[in-house]
Amino acid sequence: MKHSHEEIRKIIPEMRRVQQIHFIGIGGAGMSGIAEILLNEGYQISGSDIADGVVTQRLAQAGAKIYIGHAEEHIEGASVVVVSSAIKDDNPELVTSKQKRIPVIQRAQMLAEIMRFRHGIAVAGTHGKTTTTAMISMIYTQAKLDPTFVNGGLVKSAGKNAHLGASRYLIAEADESDASFLHLQPMVSVVTNMEPDHMDTYEGDFEKMKATYVKFLHNLPFYGLAVMCADDPVLMELVPKVGRQVITYGFSEQADYRIEDYEQTGFQGHYTVICPNNERINVLLNVPGKHNALNATAALAVAKEEGIANEAILEALADFQGAGRRFDQLGEFIRPNGKVRLVDDYGHHPTEVGVTIKAAREGWGDKRIVMIFQPHRYSRTRDLFDDFVQVLSQVDALIMLDVYAAGEAPIVGADSKSLCRSIRNLGKVDPILVSDTSQLGDVLDQIIQDGDLILAQGAGSVSKISRGLAESWKN
């Protein structure tokens, strides 16, 4: 569904002078979703990225002008430039935009404009926000409310990470990594949990991070709703400071929407939610782990508070196939030593890695877990080094790839070799460092056994590597 420029004036009247919007770093998950929404609203979209891929190709097919690589001439004709937080200050397109006095804004500022004239539901938190955003989006879709959604990962049921709906509802993932979620002014805000991460943004001060989240929740109008996880002690510490209505969810006895009797059979979860009015709702999930039960209950709480019928909620949750790269099963493969299953997962923080391992253990019984782990950013590896050592020691076999730098300079003692050394010293697993990923398949064939679950874990290029491995194993 595309709109004419006359129709755009009715959708976002204040943006009527904007004709062309240029995205620097358009291939990123958050950037591409916003670009797709604006493209479907009828704006001319251009964008650049350092590499071509599925996302940039899809945008090009939809009508966006895509450039591979960055050059000053790419911003020609742009009314406004949207910049990813990954873009450096010396980027030629960014430099030229400022010289030409073209407005340059963060992606969250553009998302805020899209949200301004809609009923916004924003999902924040250190872990689980992509999955929770996807679940809420699918519930509203199942309820025939045709929401607009912008997610940080693929919504598998929809086959994309963004959709322009016809209704007033907008469901969006809120990014705390650069504190840009403070631009958003939603009607409902979900916070899944809070742990120290992206601490460079918060000057290494967790108290500053907490205060920023409270400020985010105070962007709600006085009649808005905050939905917070009762199992997270940091969030419960913040509740008295939130001057808005707060609804909680979780396994905790104090939760307004309380999870009881959780059981996992294979990779399927089922449990009961006790609602504030003591209504009991039986939930079936086809994604594993208690962390996904929490994500689903956050989505259920939002939907119930906004008056959506149980039938739509339960059907959407039962049909939910997961978000892209969240326990993404790539298939079963016959290898020289037997049959193995390969799973790709985005988790790159020790807590995320831990819950993925736990869900795999519960679903995979007494089978071995072989992990291919790619640390993401030197700064995160440094800040959470001891936590990584502990959690990565929980698997049966560990292959370590080099750190995915994400533009950072190396930090002494925060590389994969150092991580391997400390894990080996702990004595629970003997990691294998594989710097040349072309050797990964051969290394795996030497260590895997019949029935193994192979977890490819991390936020960098490990997904592409694991999918390449799956393709080669099919042949």
Curated annotation (Swiss-Prot):
**Could you tell me what reaction this enzyme catalyses?**
UDP-N-acetyl-alpha-D-muramate + L-alanine + ATP = UDP-N-acetyl-alpha-D-muramoyl-L-alanine + ADP + phosphate + H(+)
Residues binding ATP, per UniProt:
G125, T126, H127, G128, K129, T130, T131
What pathway is this protein said to act in by its record? Cell wall biogenesis; peptidoglycan biosynthesis
Could you tell me the keywords of this UniProt record? ATP-binding, Cell cycle, Cell division, Cell shape, Cell wall biogenesis/degradation, Cytoplasm, Ligase, Nucleotide-binding, Peptidoglycan synthesis
Species lineage: Bacteria, Pseudomonadati, Pseudomonadota, Gammaproteobacteria, Pasteurellales
User: Its function?
Assistant: Cell wall formation.
Top-tier EC class:
ligase
Species: Haemophilus influenzae (strain ATCC 51907 / DSM 11121 / KW20 / Rd)
The record's section on InterPro entries has: Mur-like_cat_sf, Mur_ligase_C, Mur_ligase_C_dom_sf, Mur_ligase_cen, Mur_ligase_N, MurCDEF_pg_biosynth, UDP-N-AcMur_Ala_ligase_MurC
UniProt-recorded Gene Ontology molecular function terms: ATP binding; UDP-N-acetylmuramate-L-alanine ligase activity
Q: Which domain of life is it from?
A: Bacteria
Localization annotation: Cytoplasm
**Name used for this protein in its record:** UDP-N-acetylmuramate--L-alanine ligase
